């Protein structure tokens, strides 16, 4: 494929599946991680056993200087960035009146500021090259809101706002910007849900099942290769919320 792809938050969950599958399809993948070094190294070793290359890079992309380092590393080594996938994120269940300043700031920094920093730094290279693809991973909660997850919902809604606004601004530079807003996906982030809660959610989903990380990855592939889709919030949720 010969496209250079940065995936943030790529050591676990949806990000790991995205990075792994794109690497298998011969995209040049820079898999970013922050705290989960063990999982990132395991991903690299797993793929190397199949003679598949993947690059890993440690950076806390909620900090401007470390986001810059990741972007500069990629450009210096590979010459360009074709695709940026902003996936890094955290979640927290907490009643609104119990959310502390630290909780709020940590959520906004990790989920929203990281998108701002990574996208702003990457866009400079994409504008110069007159092409690019930016895919943000938001959430259905950013669209409909979630009880006891106000700060999470706000951070994800902000990502969708960036997506729509930036798509208009970057369109003339042939840079496409889209969001994928997953519903409930079977990843570590949702491990806090009980079996009863999962079953209750399934009853609300027309397809009566929880999504898989691979469902998101397939959409990522399509958005990378597409040439005319921009400014869209694509919710992969099994029909939840219809």
Residue locations for each model-derived region?
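Conserved glycine-rich cofactor-binding loop
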Residues: 11-12
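Alpha-helical segment proximal to the catalytic Tyr-Lys
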Residues: 124, 168-172
